[in-house]
Amino acid sequence: MEIRQNVKFKKPLIHYITNPISINDCANMILAAGAKPIMAEHPLEVSEITSASKSLGVNIGNITDNKMKSMLISGKTAYENKIPQVIDLVGVGCSKLRLDYAKKFISECHPNVIKGNMSEIKAIYGIKSSAKGIDVGACDIITEQNFDENIEMIKRLSMETGSVVAATGVVDIISNGTYTYIISNGCEMLSMITGTGCMLTGIIASYISSGNILEGTALAIVLMGICGELSQHVKGTGSFRNELIDNIFSISDDIIIKKIRINSY
């Protein structure tokens, strides 16, 4: 839990270029995690902003020409200055434009973390997926039958890119090619409001800011899953969203340790 406490103490500046659908919730989630967000996306300022930040997050959920340009500028700046960065492959299987752009970003910016659902991870790896827009396709959901196969694919993608790969879903798989974690926390309501994946990327960006990439990514995913479980008692999705942010802000280390469900593979 040292990573979490360091973020709360140091309050690192996190540069997050995300989509307008979830930008407000993402900024609030970064604040709840203990860091400070800046959501700048103008091409003429993003290099300067990234250089002054401790971590970078980019999200391709709602791309525009300017945003695509800005993310590449920031990604290259982060790589050149050894600033940790994470790319969220939102809807990467939706279009050739997104897929080609994501591949270009990964090859030129070398993000420390590549995050997506299993449909998105399969698409970036080059395997046909059954994505439904930004949602994971039914055929891509991790099951007992395809569990080992998917883990091997995630490990290969990690080794090929040099990035930690985080595949999120009913079961979350995080790997750096050598060490692999399986996380089973979470709840269905996390998939019933828009932007929870984008919010998670903001927490990942916050927790990898110290340079502890694999453990920071895993801790962020564990935290979101547990806080989802703690928030699901509410009467509806609007209340769930607010409760989720509150729990990210207030949860104790003792509760995380008590409720964590993580295994090494």
From Swiss-Prot:
One Pfam short name: HK
GO molecular function, one term: magnesium ion binding
Swiss-Prot/TrEMBL keywords: ATP-binding, Kinase, Magnesium, Metal-binding, Nucleotide-binding, Thiamine biosynthesis, Transferase
Enzyme Commission number(s) of this protein: 2.7.1.50
Top EC class for this record: transferase
Protein's pathway: Cofactor biosynthesis; thiamine diphosphate biosynthesis; 4-methyl-5-(2-phosphoethyl)-thiazole from 5-(2-hydroxyethyl)-4-methylthiazole: step 1/1
Reactions it catalyzes: 5-(2-hydroxyethyl)-4-methylthiazole + ATP = 4-methyl-5-(2-phosphooxyethyl)-thiazole + ADP + H(+)
GO biological process, one term: thiamine biosynthetic process
Binding sites annotated in the UniProt record for substrate: 39, 195
SUPFAM superfamilies in UniProt: Ribokinase-like
Cofactor(s) needed by this chain: Mg(2+)
Residues annotated as binding ATP: 115, 168
Family assignment from sequence similarity: Belongs to the Thz kinase family.
HAMAP family registered for this protein in UniProt: Thz_kinase
Known role: Catalyzes the phosphorylation of the hydroxyl group of 4-methyl-5-beta-hydroxyethylthiazole (THZ).
The protein's name in its UniProt record: Hydroxyethylthiazole kinase 2
